[in-house]
């Protein structure tokens, strides 16, 4: 029974010596030789043995980690009768323990719902077992500490005790195996006549030391290899040394040997670096960690430092280096990429390496949480927990597990989209609405549904799809909820979930995905689908095993299962024989590597800027370690560990070391280089730093040629270089050679043409062919005024909405257009009610105005947007505010009518083929025509002797005025069109001809009067009248004006219309008026604009040409922005800049362009 320690820095040949020693001994005796290495190194050590010359296979030699050795010995001695708990199971049990003790927690009661909390607790409990720290010691130590620490340890204690109670000596964790191993080693026959070699560790936990002590007592010899600085053993421990942990391990092993009366052979020290093949790498490895500054005066061959623009440029630079190294004879398996922050690089590396045709193995387990099956389970449980809210329901729906396997996915997705649109538009946000008896009724309703028409065939077909999909969701989800709410124990809850997964045929869905992935060659994806079901089965089995008899409620079950789902990970396949390995620095499973790329060497990353991420802060640990010395030290006392990690990286390669860092992150934030890089550059005075650029155009031709390493990656660079060339920048001949090379091969030529076509890309549309235009819009264009205004706003917007019939997804929310519908509907209803009762505007009292408004709102509220105004308390309040506006508008209109001779003769008057008035017909080219149809809010009439006047009033929920500039550009055609139609059809409407009296906007809003002193009721009414003055354009005729405001006096302004009378009885310049001749010119011009638009539509005009008038553009509220891709930064995408001009100028232009129609 002997202990021997082999010591020396990394790369000095310790592992090679041990393997050689064993190879000699195997031939000399029949002993068993066991190598114990860290978990992540077992595969690499086995591979090294197999590749070892003169070693006759593995006979007589076994490679174990501590945990694998525990399995082996416990299988032999009978210590495996208890059930093993995975990390997932541990976190679920901890969550159950925390939930049970939640009311007793002093600090962690809120943290129990925080994601990651249970993983942190699991890590702390793991540490306690590894370091043989009892909870009693923790509690005792915390007694004399601050209240904060004491409360924290109190919470940890009661959760830990409940956790141990739930395990109840029936279950084992990884750490329990080492405890049992230490107990069972003496009973093992397998360890008789055995020598143990322990290699690859820098430190040992207390549990591992206990196991090593038992092995010392049992086995013939225990040899331990430690990477440490030999002088520190001889001259004393340096508190901040990177070898502090291994030096402490050295002394702990000697103390163990002494306690167990074990013979200690003389230490064997290795001093010379044998791994590094160049002086520079050997110097760097030997000098690292020395307090004394050491400088390398020669040119440092095979050591390089690179700055990159960003992480992508960095990885592309690494990829180019790898490609060059393979041309020089290296294999991919000779190289590894190491980083401290793997999460910043894994996806990027996978993408870039694929474009360079470099096989890569990413040594990182991926969380299962994003797999559709896991998301389906989580979302289904959340749907039940949150009363069938939209978000979790459709997160589950989109995984496709509710639907049959037989039907095509594309068909199912289309149907699911139809269902989702219906649910969103109808505000279906709870279980009651989902389970409500009877079919859901589908009608394509826009605005007020006062006149319900029979369903169309299309609506009936859509309704059928909606109810089909609804039943596929409701049936299994209702069953799941029923079973979960009946469940009392963990077993019953788990069975409810399992039966739900059976009901939706989850296994068949996963199997179909697996088969399809295999057929398409996506083997890794196929394995993930296979693992997903296995993982859930194991999770439920483990849940039942541990918590099956525990009493639970629904919330607790969902929280515990969610914790388990968060902990699930996909297992990794070992790397193939020839792949580049990407790994994080701390867990790299590497032994002998020729080339290392250490990436992401930034300040704060290497060395790591320490943060308190665990349950116990650094301050907590420092305070507790005064009495619980086995507890791991705080981060600030582990400074040497960062130096050691860097040392492992720089001492790993035998041939080449590439060190790199990005100068900026993805958002352009500046990143500094690591202090370690500054230190290395200080030691190597002749070490020059090169740059990995995104754009190599500034480099020399020779340097640019190094960027050409693969056809796919080079094509992207070539495109960007040619783009710069188009802008006038010089282009190296290197890129012309690359360009020509793509057209020497047919397949590559096709790919190049497709990619390089982007050089000539312009975001422009081509006019539709005549036939296509007529198919989309018809030879006779049936259009509304707003449609034509949209065409003049942007031709492509018109094409998207009226040609392609694209629609924005409807949502169950009250929008401005809905409020406009309510206001129009209310005014129509009140006017109709007055007519039914033989009453006129102006004859109502204030009380009657309020009553009318209330009755109108009562009638309209259930008829807008699927009863949205009745759907919630918030909507009830909005309804109240809308009622205030309608009441105010009714009162104002009533007061205006008292002072006006104009009376309504038409409300919500339809014009069109089926309207009260015929459509406005506009002749177009090629014998086509445009039929204009729509609805006029209100038509007023007044008579004076032999003259009859007609005017248009439009109700608006926001302030509007008639701007002739907007009329001229076709953006505001509505009011003058309506005026033209009623004047043209006056004989049909009122039985006589009429003159145009004007167009006015009535702003419906809840106005307030501001005053410095208290006002009488009469004064308040006058102020409200003044604030409610209608805007627009009226006839420049004193007679017409006097009919609009019968109270208007000389020298006064009207409170009703935009008019002011001078003392001489004429209209002032401040009045917004136009002559009869000007109105006629405007009417003719408007018809001309419709003709212009109609002809352009038939010509296939679909240009992306939004206007810009001051700061206003149609893009601001356009639902098709992502579709058209309009980008003002492109030369091909520019606004049509419109300018405001004087009224006289605009009228002159209208006269010239409009002419007589």
Curated annotation (Swiss-Prot):
ATP binds at residues 8-15. It comes from Listeria monocytogenes serotype 4b (strain F2365). GO terms for molecular function: 4 iron, 4 sulfur cluster binding; 5'-3' exonuclease activity; ATP binding; double-stranded DNA binding; helicase activity; metal ion binding. Transmembrane segments: none annotated. Its EC number is 3.1.-.-. [4Fe-4S] cluster binds at residues 794, 1115, 1118, 1124. Residues 1-278 form the UvrD-like helicase ATP-binding domain. Heterodimer of AddA and AddB. Belongs to the helicase family. AddB/RexB type 1 subfamily. Its cofactor is Mg(2+); [4Fe-4S] cluster. Despite having conserved helicase domains, this subunit does not have helicase activity. This is ATP-dependent helicase/deoxyribonuclease subunit B. Residues 272-590 form the UvrD-like helicase C-terminal domain. Binds 1 [4Fe-4S] cluster. GO terms for biological process: double-strand break repair via homologous recombination. The heterodimer acts as both an ATP-dependent DNA helicase and an ATP-dependent, dual-direction single-stranded exonuclease. Recognizes the chi site generating a DNA molecule suitable for the initiation of homologous recombination. The AddB subunit has 5' -> 3' nuclease activity but not helicase activity. Keywords: 4Fe-4S, ATP-binding, DNA damage, DNA repair, DNA-binding, Exonuclease, Helicase, Hydrolase, Iron, Iron-sulfur, Metal-binding, Nuclease, Nucleotide-binding. InterPro entries: ADDB_N, DNA_helicase_suAddB, DNA_helicase_UvrD-like_C, P-loop_NTPase, PDDEXK-like_dom_sf, PDDEXK_AddAB-type. It is an enzyme of class 3 (hydrolase). It comes from the Bacteria.
